A protein has these predicted regions:
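Active-site loop of short-chain dehydrogenase/reductase
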Residues: 70-72, 122-135, 169-173
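A short, exposed helix-loop element centered on a Lys and neighboring polar residues
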Residues: 115-116, 161
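C-terminal helical subdomain
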Residues: 176-177, 193-238
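Substrate-binding pocket helix/loop in short-chain dehydrogenase/reductase
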Residues: 85-101
Length: 238
């Protein structure tokens, strides 16, 4: 299996690079800069493409030039948020215009251009699959006030629905992962029990997201998961 992961240098993206593959697979990481000392299971081949999603047209072209002519899975782990998001200091009316434009550019425009260039290569696979990293902020009545971030993640739901319809005949599986607050401080090398203890139930370990994605990748071509909602156990919004 050949898997491309966009937004792969740190946090969840890096955990996916290090955790979803098994012997014989190829993982292609994409980020602005290639990280050091990526730890992979034995028998997994690593490739890397350096591209800055803040310049979406240039990034999409660069990725398309370097990507394989065919691969099986595209995981779009693309997303930035407001500087004061998820803090008491957030105020939509105080957000700089250019910051909102930059957020939309990375979270929506870059994702669309990337999909436009890479979906044809996915369709060469006998089991093509797209996984979009969304957020519980994209759910109705999520209880979050971050307007631009929430709107950008809500847009991914529309992208996923439209992709499914447009390529239903090609059996393209498209999944949105609606993730709650993540513990991205503890890498996969940290025992999951220790990672789960951080935040006292308020943070989802990346280990759990990796476990779910592994399951998605191992489904037969007769089924797919349309949407998966994964909040932290102590999240009072759910």
């Amino acid at each position: 299996m050949k898997i491309m992961i966009v937004g792969a240098s740190r946090g969840l993206g890096r955990a996916l690079v290090e955790g979803v593959c098994r012997a014989g697979d190829t993982v292609i990481g994409v980020s602005r800069r290639r990280p050091d000392a990526v730890m992979l299971p034995p028998g997994v081949e690593l490739q890397w493409i350096e591209a800055d999603m803040a310049s979406p047209a240039e990034a999409a072209t660069r990725i398309a030039q370097a990507a394989p002519s065919a691969f099986d899975v595209l995981i779009c782990n693309v997303g930035i948020w407001e500087a004061t998001a998820f803090t008491d200091g957030y105020a939509f009316l105080d957000e700089p215009d250019d910051a909102i434009v930059d957020l939309v550019t990375v979270n929506i425009t870059a994702t669309l251009l990337l999909l436009k260039r890479l979906v044809p290569r996915l369709l060469e696979s006998c089991k093509p699959q797209v996984i979009l990293t969304g957020s519980t902020s994209a759910l109705r009545q999520s209880g979050r006030p971050e307007v631009a971030f929430g709107a950008s993640k809500f847009a991914l739901n529309g992208v996923a629905d439209a992709l499914r319809e447009g390529f239903r005949g090609s059996r393209l599986a498209v999944t949105c992962l609606q993730l709650g607050n993540l513990n991205t401080d503890d890498a996969l090398s940290v025992p999951i029990e220790e990672a789960a203890a951080r935040g006292d139930g308020g943070l989802v370990p990346v280990h759990d997201v990796v476990a779910v994605v592994r399951t998605l990748l191992r489904l037969s071509d007769a089924a797919f998961v349309r949407e998966l909602v994964m909040p932290a156990i102590a999240d009072e919004r759910f």
